[in-house]
């Protein structure tokens, strides 16, 4: 194959060639069907771009593509270098995405058939030489090759170059088979099996054959068959789709400018214009076409007549006409549909892969778990989770009955209890691997909510919102004059550019606005109207008070009419009213009674009253009391006129009326003459004590009559920001969020983190992860982050510091700790010089502005104990009683007692006083007694306690033991062990239940004797369950007997088990019951002590004293 010269610039295709039909709509019906299938499958595939078009071509290199499409026309008739068919490209050639010639599958199929036919024609041409000679002469005359218009070269075509000069995309390889249509790598891509070749009689007349052009096929029928193949296919399609019509023939569309309506041989689908995605061709590109030759024009006439293609320029004008384009942009519809499909597809993908999380429990939603889907936001939740949420207090709607969705806050009335599929037709749907989880697998059939669409969703049961209805409908504009094709379910109303011209509310004028929805605006023409009486006029809009005109006026001014009545004597007293005025009420034929209405005039005429002739004659009076009701008084007592029957208004009332205050709390009596109106009231001085609506303040209004006491004060409470106060009227509940905002950047202290404006009031500075850059008191390393507080956190670096009293040098002390106490006493010498500070290690002075109050340690002169008075450094010790405690004992040493020192000395003084009393006789005889020796320091220390009865009994026992030569170590009288075995608490508990103690002691004695006499080294006894006090007695007695005691079980079945051990368990010499009985018995009186006294040295003693000083018999004084 000869190679064409290189091409520079853009490709030029001959727009007049047969194969270059940029806006061919021959197969629009099939394209519409394919497009509808693509729309219905978009959600399932989540693929929003149409599949790549079929390109019937071979894999031709880029250089060969340039050679194929490059050819110049030579007017001189010279043959070009390239023998291949070439086309002059127009700049408007589209990319592979457009629906031009190279994207039409039916065109490729037709080219394939033409290719076979031309091959047959070429074989016949080679066999006949005369035909070849004629063919060469024809070429020289016309200067063109027949193969320029042969469709067989279309198989060499590839995707057209982009208008911007981009490299064309790689063409798709097709594998030819005996099936219908081409197959892409074994896959059937397009099937067009209904095309048939038209019969020869369907072809056009022979005059359509171009002059000077010889076809390779010498047969005329073969020539017609090749030329009219496209036309026959088009006729076949029109028979299959008789309802199709071009877009400009849609009902309600306006005619295209510069074009007469075509004959309707067949109707095309109304959506064909919407399915065509081919962009308009610029007018500049149309003007750049080269001039057509005569041959080209004739060839174009034949081709246009055979294939009935649409003119390119007219199609461009139709697409650019703004009146023909639908008012709803398809781009916006695709955008909305894409958002819906993205939401639904995302839900399907996440539910299928189990990656969707429940917003309540934050757990993954499994394919087998029961779920519930919100019909407002389409979020999916676990059924159990949404039940718990719906019953929780947090889900309750404010002021409404129902519960709120956790995602969209949509209020629902009923709590879901059943697990249903997304469309709601099947309960408890079973999960299938081939279906969407939680769906029933049937068609959705849900209606579009809130839209005027009769169609239902035709997708399978799915989560998320249903896609918009894909159907189209013809909708009338608001004024009803034009109709437009719009998407079904579109809530947008259609408007045309015509005026409305509906009758306005006045009924006279027409609406001059453009086509609009709703009612027309009231008529805006201003008219001047006069009232019925003619005294007042006004300017109103046309249509105001329609139907109220009486021919003279149009409204009532609410003034007295004042027109002259027919009588000519009186004027109309009614309020301004439509004509005519009523008759004069004083006419004789109208007046039937006296002025008070109690007596008819006929009776008065019989009594001699004169008859009335005109309205000016007075009405006769009956002479009775008028009795007409007056406006004063009350409902219980109505005041009446007290005058005699009279004409005109009744006079003032002479009685009094009781009126109430505004709040009806108090009443007041006033003369009727002072009442100016029937509803006369006054204000009392009672203040309202009810709470205002804010709940914080009281009303406090005087004579309040309000039902809702609104608070006029300003709230004034601080808002959450802490900087501003609420400026709204005082209200209940929490204040609103502070609406103040700053338009300055809010940064952290170091400036690394920034919050850009607007910044709501009260917003805290952003958190920063950088290290704090402030100047710190210490030079230790900084470990805390940047912060907004004024003070940095304390430094925690461990250091060594002295305590406050300089006692210890402590380690591991945080740097921020300053005053450290070691916990030891201060021991610093106080200013008094005698004492030391007793406080723990502290800071500062030991005593601040206060004297030392520690006790004085100076020994007393009389007893030697310290002074113990508050510290008195500069003064002598005060004379006070010594409060030190000393130990006193009796003469035998058995009794010991701690006594205050001053009390001990007073006891000695009492003893000394008794001794002085014995010498009182000497004082009576004139003698003197020296008492200085009675109270001495030594004698004070020798103070003793008096022996008691036990001391005497113990003394007797000692003497008896000495008499029988019994050693004291043997303890014959059980003096040391008798009181040491049993404790005081055991004795007190045993006194409460002696019988129980006796039984326990018997059991223990038996147990101890059994283990000592038996063969076993241990033996146990279990006591029955008992209370805590009895168990404590058993434990204490077990210690006395040398037994082991353990408590088992729990209350109230807790008991004690005692165990006797040989060699350890011993019975005490005296039982506890015996000790208690001896103590409880009455003691015998103690023996009378006998003291030996020396003979009285005083010769003057009386005989009475001698008798009293008899010797005391000592029964234990055994003398040898």
Curated annotation (Swiss-Prot):
Would I find Cell division among this entry's keywords?
Answer: no
A single GO BP: protein autoubiquitination
Enzymatic class? transferase
Q: Identify the residues that the record assigns to the R3H domain, covering every copy.
A: 994-1062
Polar residues bias spans: 73-106, 124-141, 1097-1106
Output compositional bias ranges, type Basic and acidic residues: 142-159, 188-202, 222-254, 282-291
Q: List the disulfide bonds.
A: none
Residue ranges of the region described as Interaction with PABPC1 and PABC4 = 9-26
InterPro entries for the chain: NFX1_fam, R3H_dom, R3H_dom_sf, R3H_NF-X1, Znf_NFX1, Znf_PHD-finger, Znf_RING
Give the ZnF (RING-type) ranges: 358-409
The source's superkingdom equals: Eukaryota
Induction pattern:
By IFNG/IFN-gamma.
UniProt EC number:
2.3.2.-
Question: Which residues carry the post-translational modification Phosphoserine, per the record?
Answer: 50, 82, 95, 129, 150, 326
**Pfam family name, one:** R3H
Query: Which portions of the sequence form the region Disordered?
Result: 22-295, 1081-1109
Residue intervals of every NF-X1-type zinc finger in the record: 453-471, 506-525, 567-586, 632-655, 694-713, 721-740, 832-854, 863-884
**What UniProt keywords apply to this chain's record, in alphabetical order?**
Activator, DNA-binding, Host-virus interaction, Metal-binding, Nucleus, Phosphoprotein, Repeat, Repressor, Transcription, Transcription regulation, Transferase, Ubl conjugation, Ubl conjugation pathway, Zinc, Zinc-finger
SMART domains named among the record's database cross-references: R3H, RING, ZnF_NFX
Posttranslational modification: Isoform 3 is polyubiquitinated in the presence of HPV16 E6 protein; which leads to proteasomal degradation. Isoform 1 is not polyubiquitinated.
Q: List, as start-end ranges, the regions of compositional bias called Basic residues.
A: 111-120
Q: How does it assemble?
A: Isoform 1 interacts with PABPC1 and PABPC4.
What does the entry's domain section say? The RING-type zinc finger domain interacts with an ubiquitin-conjugating enzyme (E2) and facilitates ubiquitination.
UniProt function note: Binds to the X-box motif of MHC class II genes and represses their expression. May play an important role in regulating the duration of an inflammatory response by limiting the period in which MHC class II molecules are induced by interferon-gamma. Isoform 3 binds to the X-box motif of TERT promoter and represses its expression. Together with PABPC1 or PABPC4, isoform 1 acts as a coactivator for TERT expression. Mediates E2-dependent ubiquitination.
PANTHER family assigned to the protein according to its UniProt record, in alphabetical order: NUCLEAR TRANSCRIPTION FACTOR, X-BOX BINDING 1 NFX1, TRANSCRIPTIONAL REPRESSOR NF-X1
Report the protein name in the record: Transcriptional repressor NF-X1
């Amino acid at each position: 194959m000869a190679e064409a010269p290189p091409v520079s610039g853009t490709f030029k295709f001959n727009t007049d060639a047969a194969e270059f039909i940029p806006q061919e709509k021959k197969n629009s019906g099939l394209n519409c069907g394919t497009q509808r299938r693509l729309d219905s499958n978009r959600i399932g595939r989540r693929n929003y771009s149409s599949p790549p078009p079929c390109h019937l071509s071979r894999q031709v290199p880029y250089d060969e593509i340039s050679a194929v499409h490059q050819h110049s026309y030579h007017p001189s008739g010279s043959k070009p270098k390239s023998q291949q068919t070439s086309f002059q490209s127009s700049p408007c050639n589209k990319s592979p995405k457009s629906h031009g010639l190279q994207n039409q599958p039916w065109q490729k199929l037709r080219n394939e058939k033409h290719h076979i036919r031309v091959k047959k024609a070429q074989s016949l041409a080679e066999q006949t030489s005369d035909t070849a000679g004629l063919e060469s002469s024809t070429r020289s005359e016309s200067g063109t090759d027949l193969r320029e218009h042969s469709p067989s070269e279309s198989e060499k075509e590839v995707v057209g170059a982009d208008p911007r000069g981009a490299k064309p995309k790689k063409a798709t390889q097709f594998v030819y088979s005996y099936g219908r249509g081409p197959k892409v790598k074994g896959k059937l891509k397009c099937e067009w099996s209904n095309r048939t070749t038209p019969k020869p009689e369907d072809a056009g007349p022979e005059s359509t054959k171009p002059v000077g052009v010889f076809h390779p096929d010498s047969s005329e029928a073969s020539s017609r068959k090749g030329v009219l193949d496209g036309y026959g296919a088009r006729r076949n399609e029109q028979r299959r789709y008789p309802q199709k019509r071009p877009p400009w023939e849609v009902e309600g569309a306006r005619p295209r400018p510069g074009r007469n309506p075509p004959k309707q041989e067949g109707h095309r689908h109304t959506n064909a214009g919407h399915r065509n995605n081919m962009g308009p061709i610029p007018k500049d590109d149309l003007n750049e076409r080269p001039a057509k030759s005569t041959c080209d024009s004739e060839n174009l006439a034949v081709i246009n007549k055979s294939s009935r293609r649409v003119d390119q320029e007219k199609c461009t004008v139709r697409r650019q006409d703004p009146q023909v384009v639908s008012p709803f942009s398809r781009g916006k519809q695709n955008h909305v549909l894409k958002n819906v499909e993205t939401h639904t597809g995302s839900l399907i993908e996440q539910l299928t892969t189990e990656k969707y999380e429940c917003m309540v429990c934050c757990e993954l939603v499994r394919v087998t778990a029961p779920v519930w889907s919100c019909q407002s936001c389409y979020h999916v939740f676990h059924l159990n989770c949404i039940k718990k949420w719906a019953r929780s207090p947090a889900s309750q709607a404010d002021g409404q009955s129902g519960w709120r969705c956790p995602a969209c806050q949509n209020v629902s009335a009923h709590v879901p209890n059943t697990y249903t599929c997304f469309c709601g037709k099947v309960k408890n749907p079973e999960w299938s691997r081939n279906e969407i989880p939680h769906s029933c697998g049937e068609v959705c059939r849900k209606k579009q909510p809130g839209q005027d669409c009769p169609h239902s969703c035709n997708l399978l049961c799915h989560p998320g919102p249903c896609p918009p209805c894909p159907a189209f409908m013809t909708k009338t504009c608001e004024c009803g004059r034009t109709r437009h094709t719009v998407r079904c379910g579109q809530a947008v109303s259609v408007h045309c550019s015509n005026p409305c011209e509906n009758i306005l509310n006045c009924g006279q004028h027409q609406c001059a606005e453009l086509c609009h929805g709703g009612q027309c605006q009231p008529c805006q023409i201003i008219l001047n109207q006069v009232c019925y009486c003619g005294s007042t006029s006004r300017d109103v809009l046309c249509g105001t008070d329609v139907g109220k005109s009486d021919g003279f006026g149009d409204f009532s001014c609410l003034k007295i009419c004042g027109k002259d009545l027919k009588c000519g004597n009186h004027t109309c007293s009614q309020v301004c009213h439509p004509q005519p005025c009523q008759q004069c009420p004083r006419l004789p034929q109208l007046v039937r009674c006296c002025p008070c209405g109690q007596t008819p005039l006929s009776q008065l005429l019989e009594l001699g009253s004169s008859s009335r002739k005109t309205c000016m004659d007075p009405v006769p009076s009956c002479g009775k009391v008028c009795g007409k009701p007056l406006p004063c008084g009350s409902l219980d007592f109505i005041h009446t006129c007290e005058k005699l029957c009279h004409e005109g208004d009744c006079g003032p009332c002479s009685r009094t009326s009781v009126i109430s205050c505004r709040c009806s709390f108090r009443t007041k009596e006033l003369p009727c003459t002072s009442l100016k109106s029937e509803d006369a009231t006054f204000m009392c001085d009672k203040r309202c004590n009810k709470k205002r609506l804010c709940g914080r303040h009281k009303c406090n209004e005087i004579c309040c009559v309000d039902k809702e006491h609104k608070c006029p004060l300003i709230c004034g409470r601080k808002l959450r920001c802490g900087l501003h106060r609420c400026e709204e009227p005082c209200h209940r509940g929490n204040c609103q969020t502070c609406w103040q905002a700053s338009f300055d950047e809010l940064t952290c202290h170091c400036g690394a983190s920034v919050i850009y404006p607007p910044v709501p009031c009260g917003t805290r500075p952003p958190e920063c992860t950088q290290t704090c850059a402030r100047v710190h008191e210490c030079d230790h390393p900084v470990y805390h982050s940047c912060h907004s507080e004024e003070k940095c956190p304390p430094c925690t670096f461990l250091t060594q510091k002295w305590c406050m009293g300089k006692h210890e040098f402590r380690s591991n002390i945080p740097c921020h700790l300053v005053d450290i106490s070691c916990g030891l006493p201060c021991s610093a010498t106080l200013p008094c010089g005698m004492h030391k500070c007793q406080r723990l290690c502290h800071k500062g002075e030991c005593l601040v502005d206060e004297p030392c109050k520690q006790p004085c340690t100076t020994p007393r002169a009389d007893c030697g104990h310290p002074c113990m008075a508050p510290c008195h450094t500069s003064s002598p010790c005060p004379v006070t009683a010594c409060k030190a405690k000393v130990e006193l004992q009796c003469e035998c040493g058995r009794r010991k007692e701690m006594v205050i020192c001053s009390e001990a000395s007073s006891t000695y003084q009492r003893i000394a006083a008794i001794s002085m009393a014995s010498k009182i006789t000497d004082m009576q005889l004139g003698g003197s007694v020296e008492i200085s020796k009675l109270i001495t320091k030594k004698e004070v220390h020798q103070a003793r306690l008096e022996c008691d009865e036990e001391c005497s009994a113990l003394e007797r026992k000692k003497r008896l033991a000495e008499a029988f030569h019994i050693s004291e170590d043997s303890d014959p009288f059980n003096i040391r062990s008798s009181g040491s075995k049993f404790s005081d608490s055991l004795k007190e508990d045993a006194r409460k239940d002696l019988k129980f103690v006796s039984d326990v002691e018997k059991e223990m004695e038996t147990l101890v004797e059994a283990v000592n006499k038996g063969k076993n080294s241990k033996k146990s006894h279990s006591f029955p369950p008992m209370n805590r006090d009895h168990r404590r007695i058993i434990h204490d007695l077990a210690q006395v007997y040398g037994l082991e005691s353990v408590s088992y079980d729990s209350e109230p079945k807790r008991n004690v088990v005692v165990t006797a051990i040989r060699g350890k368990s011993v019975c005490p010499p005296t039982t506890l019951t015996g000790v208690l009985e001896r103590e409880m018995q009455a003691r015998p009186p103690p023996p009378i002590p006998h003291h030996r006294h020396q003979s009285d040295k005083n010769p003057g003693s009386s005989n009475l004293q001698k008798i009293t000083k008899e010797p005391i018999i000592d029964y234990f004084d055994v003398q040898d």
